[in-house]
């Protein structure tokens, strides 16, 4: 219950929160951080009441990857680094959508049951895609497991995210 209370104090009911996960456990899986601002522009154009929440894990490497995204999206909720796993799961469960790299956070988002869009480059979506009926993935063009994630276009991600939003209903 305390984790849900913490989550509700950060991500309140009625907000249209889209979670972004710009980090991963190795840099080859990290979609370029500069892509999140144009992605957010596309999402916000279609959903003007939306607000971003940036999720990342503990440690300086995670924070360093998240900082440019937080700086580019000044109204973003900083939902990373200092929360327990159960608090993070409770916050994710209050979001309308998760868009992020192939990472533990992506799998945690899918496990909470929210619509989840995984971004793939050199990791294999056939093995590591998020699971669940509301989960989708997009991959950089090229061979599975070898394509650089930087080749994944913003418009491809935006289209997939908007489609997933249109196909699903808000939970809170």
PLM feature segments, named:
Residues 20, 36, 157:
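Residue-level signal for inorganic ion chemistry
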